[in-house]
Amino acid sequence: MNFEQTHRDALTEVLRWRRDVRHFRPDPIDEAVIDRLRAVMDMAPSVGNARPWRVIRVDSPALRAEVLANFNAARAAAGSAYAGEQAEAYATLKLQGIDQAPLQLAVFTHRDPAAGHGLGRASMPVTLQQSTAMAFTRSGCRAGENLGLGMVSVLDPKAVERLLNAPPDWDFVAWLCIGVPEFTDDTPLLHRAGWQENLPTEWERR
């Protein structure tokens, strides 16, 4: 298929309005929309076609509450690295949507999946994690569904694995919060908050 300028423009807009958000409305997401997000993840490439990502949809309020407690403990521990004005700024940042997002996914990487028969990963096992990252970033079409997504990284991964009773060969990668944003913005939250501005990607040539 050859794509036209209208396709390119539409994709650029979806990517620009990436909606990496932390503030969600509680509106439930239609199951048909969730099915489309899953289908887009299924289209992702992976090393050796191993498809190492594993996803647990977490609907239980009790489990979400425990993950939020995990976050609060990890956030407090991480905050000890900052002092003065930076510590004050850190305290004001909203770094999770666990308390609001209607759809929450725990994403894991299978450390040694049978699929793919080891192709392409013997010398670079990290390609399994890279494949998982490509899979859940494919859900970037969420902006096209008028949804936002926030990845929560301030967590104790081993505690999440225990909490969700993940198999021992699954490594926790990401906690994804998905829902309709409270507001839309094409500027990353940390840039707007003054914590870290968006920087251009540096390319070098050899």
UniProtKB/Swiss-Prot annotation:
This is 5,6-dimethylbenzimidazole synthase. It comes from Rhodobacter capsulatus (Rhodopseudomonas capsulata). The keyword Transmembrane helix does not apply. It catalyses: FMNH2 + O2 = dialurate + 5,6-dimethylbenzimidazole + D-erythrose 4-phosphate + H(+). Belongs to the BluB family. It comes from the Bacteria. GO terms for biological process: cobalamin biosynthetic process. It is an enzyme of class 1 (oxidoreductase). GO terms for molecular function: 5,6-dimethylbenzimidazole synthase activity; nucleotide binding; oxidoreductase activity, acting on paired donors, with incorporation or reduction of molecular oxygen. Homooctamer. Its EC number is 1.13.11.79. Keywords: Cobalamin biosynthesis, Flavoprotein, FMN, NAD, NADP, Nucleotide-binding, Oxidoreductase. The keyword Oxidoreductase applies. FMN binds at R18, R19, D20, V21, R22, S46, L95, S153. Involved in the biosynthesis of cobalamin (vitamin B12). Catalyzes the oxidative fragmentation and contraction of the isoalloxazine heterocycle and the cleavage of the ribityl tail of FMNH(2) to form 5,6-dimethylbenzimidazole (DMB) and D-erythrose 4-phosphate (E4P). NAD(P)H is only required initially to reduce FMN and oxygen drives the oxidative fragmentation. InterPro entries: BluB (IPR012825), Nitroreductase (IPR029479), Nitroreductase-like (IPR000415), Nitroreductase/BluB (IPR050627).
